[in-house]
């Protein structure tokens, strides 16, 4: 391992031992909150500490075995043991590097999916409906709950825009690579000549930010409009101003919600989505400014950002970020998204590991 990694591990080892002494000898000195904080820090360091101690042990063992290589009687056995020990050392180093990969604090969270029809008119809206169904089926496979926050239906079907909330542990971590441009190549339902058209949609994945960690939104920065709902809602539709549109003036982020009959509930939902949008915008700007990865797997959600192409006539899906092509489009649309998500996650991990190396 690189000297810089070993030095970091030595520092983490020192901190772990320090925490162990603090928590065992000074239990009564800490209040409940401080004790919980230190215990959590110790628990987070445990796996790295354990693997580093194993690495130090195997390193010492290798030195002892190497001394036996010059012994004529034991050299053959020593060579065999050395190969086993070196293999074990390599395995431990791989585990350590995996543990050193920074964890996105929002990977375990629920998330919002915003799907917008881009180029292609009615066909783009229809395709956004197909993507919506795909994500809903994938969520069903994962036993996640899906709520529709807001939607604007297309004239010929599908959606001009739809926002879903996917509720479940790990939803954001698995879906975050869906952000970006999604292009479809097929013969539209409205095409009489049988010609293949190319249309596009954009997808943005935004983590649900817990209330305790949400960005404080100043009332003076918000423009709140109310209007009559045009969606589901029974007798309340078009009779009360229950729908809410909130604009965050400093960033230009706009969110609408008309899913609930109550204006208060719509406002609460809209603020939740707005907080996620602002966080995602700030996070994207931060990543762009301080990019640690040589190759970005996360799309910007803009029209020019073509992450994936869905070709219906060939039953083909191509993810352009990792040059992956599979001829199982029918399965992907039925919710088997892990066929694409798993390779993306593996590539993401490999990219982060290369930085550590």
From Swiss-Prot:
Primary location class: cytoplasm
**A Gene Ontology molecular-function term?**
translation release factor activity, codon specific
Post-translation changes: Methylated by PrmC. Methylation increases the termination efficiency of RF1.
Q: Which UniProt keywords apply?
A: Cytoplasm, Methylation, Protein biosynthesis
CC per GO annotation: cytoplasm
Per the UniProt record, one Pfam family is RF-1
Subcellular location, in the record's words?
Cytoplasm
Q: Can the keyword Transit peptide be found in this entry's annotation?
A: no
What residues bear N5-methylglutamine in this entry? 235
| UniProt key word Nucleotide-binding | no
NCBIfam families, per database record: prfA, PRK00591.1
Q: What does this protein do?
A: Peptide chain release factor 1 directs the termination of translation in response to the peptide chain termination codons UAG and UAA.
Q: Which PANTHER family match?
A: LD18447P
Q: What's the family? A: Belongs to the prokaryotic/mitochondrial release factor family.
- What's this protein's name? Peptide chain release factor 1
Organism, as annotated: Buchnera aphidicola subsp. Cinara cedri (strain Cc)
């Amino acid at each position: 391992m690189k000297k810089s990694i070993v030095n970091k591990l030595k520092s983490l080892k020192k901190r772990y031992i320090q925490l162990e002494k603090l928590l065992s000898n000074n239990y009564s000195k800490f209040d409940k909150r401080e004790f919980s904080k230190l215990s959590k820090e110790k628990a987070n360091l445990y796996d790295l500490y354990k693997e580093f101690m194993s690495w130090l042990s195997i390193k010492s063992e290798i030195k002892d075995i190497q001394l036996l290589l010059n012994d004529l009687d034991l050299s053959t056995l020593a060579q065999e043991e050395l190969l086993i020990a070196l293999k074990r050392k390599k395995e431990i180093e791989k585990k350590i590097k995996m543990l050193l990969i920074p964890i996105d604090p929002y990977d375990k969270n629920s998330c919002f999916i915003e799907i917008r029809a881009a180029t292609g008119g009615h066909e783009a809206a229809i395709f956004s409906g197909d993507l919506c169904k795909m994500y809903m089926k994938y969520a069903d496979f994962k036993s996640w709950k899906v709520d529709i926050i807001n939607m604007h239906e297309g004239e010929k079907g599908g959606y001009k825009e739809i926002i879903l909330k996917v509720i479940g542990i790990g939803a954001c971590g698995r879906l975050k690579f869906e952000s970006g441009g999604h292009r479809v190549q097929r013969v539209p339902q409205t095409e009489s000549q049988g010609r293949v058209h190319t249309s596009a949609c954009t997808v943005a994945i935004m983590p649900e930010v817990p209330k305790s960690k949400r960005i404080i939104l100043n009332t003076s920065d918000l423009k709140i409009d109310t209007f009559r709902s045009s969606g589901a809602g029974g007798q309340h539709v078009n009779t009360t101003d229950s729908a809410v549109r909130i604009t965050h003036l400093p960033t230009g982020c706009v969110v609408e919600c008309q899913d609930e009959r109550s204006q208060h509930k719509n406002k609460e939902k809209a603020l939740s989505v707005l907080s996620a949008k602002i966080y995602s915008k700030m996070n994207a700007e931060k990543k762009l400014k301080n990019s640690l990865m040589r190759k970005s797997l996360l799309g910007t959600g803009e029209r020019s950002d073509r992450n994936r192409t869905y070709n219906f006539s060939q039953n083909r899906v191509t993810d352009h970020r990792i040059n992956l092509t599979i001829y199982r489009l029918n399965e992907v649309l039925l919710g088997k998204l892990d066929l694409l998500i798993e390779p993306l996650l593996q590539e993401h991990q490999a990219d982060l590991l290369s930085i550590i190396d």
